Amino acid sequence: MLKQIKSDIYHLLHPKMAFFLTSVSKNDKPNVMTCAWATPVSEEPPVVIVCVSKESYTAELIKQTKEFVINIPTKKLLGALWICGKISGRDTDKFKRAGLKIIKAKKVKSPVIDGCVGHIECKVWKTVDAGECYAFFGNVISAYADEKYMRNGLWTKEAEIPLHLGGARIVYFR
Ligand SMILES: Cc1cc2nc3c(=O)[nH]c(=O)nc-3n(C[C@H](O)[C@H](O)[C@H](O)COP(=O)(O)O)c2cc1C
């Protein structure tokens, strides 16, 4: 029997990959938050959307500098993923708190997170007010992945990428 779903309707669309979304302020101060709401929307040109709460510091920064980086982690970074998803970078250095090392990105000022297996650097070309979130449409400027975990353009099961089911539940891509 099909049961009517009245709350957390979005859980029907999970699991979704949980990743680190990095951004930067006008004066080059970086931030990171955990994000799961993202999707490709165009292959040619390559465009992705990230959906970010209007209340987050990340939304403020992306609106300021119009860029972001998607950093895809493995199981090893699960602890950091929770930390970056629970506290705001407004008054905390989350990189330090979560023990994350940053590296310079190739084409944008937002940093890349060391130990992640895939990165998508984006410049925002359109922002849509989507209710409680902004949907930031990002033109993909550069994308690269660890060849140990991505073969022939596909993730291998060794990558063990965290997939968010909802709430505190994570499963792994295997
Ligand atoms: C697994 C997981 C997935 C999340 N996905 C999103 C998301 O897709 N969009 C969003 O706005 N917040 C999401 N969050 C919540 C943000 O990470 C959280 O509000 C964070 O503290 C914002 O940080 P900031 O204020 O430094 O930007 C998620 C949290 C977790 C733990």
Give each language-model segment a name.
Residues M1-R174:
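Basic, polyanion-binding surface patches
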